[in-house]
Amino acid sequence: GPVDFLNRRTLLHDLRELVQPLNVSTRQVRAAMAAAEEAQRAFYAGLQAMGAEFLSSLDRWDRVAVLVGRPYNTCDPGVSMALPYKLRALGVVPLPMDCLPLEEIDVSDRFDNMYWRSGQAILAAGRFIAREPRLQAIYVTNFGCGPDSFLLSFFRRIMSSTDGSPKVYLELELDDHTADAGVNTRCEAFFDSLAAQGTWARA
């Protein structure tokens, strides 16, 4: 059957069911879970360290765009239509939002009922980007995505800088029918508009 990650108890039960034909003990399953959790924690800690080092080296006019969205949208080259490579070709550094210190950013003052962990991370990324003049945001979504239908409006509201002025961002809705040329054109137009406002270095 399916493996439910709702909580540790449910996960342990489902994993035991899954490996039952392999004659694996409960103790071995617990040990495997602990090892997996530690590997995941170390992976995210590495991303955070890499992000902190990168941000500390940034110049005011470095061209950096944070890819905002769920990992299966932003990190998969097929789903994202190789967006990071397109940005590099335009002279822009793509930065995964997981490299930002999201755990340190509290959004409960405006969205205390956002129980969805991925939604919390996306809004935390928005708040960080809004207050960081060296970063721009590209929100990657899909056609007909239910959660994004309301999350995008929250993201738009939280994308305001410390002085209250809104910070623009690019929203890319990608699916199998999206043309490569269209993605390139929208990115170029976004970066050109930022340069015209004087908030972005020209290529």
Where are these regions (language model features)?
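An N-terminal assembly and electron-transfer interface module characteristic of large anaerobic redox
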Residues: 1-203
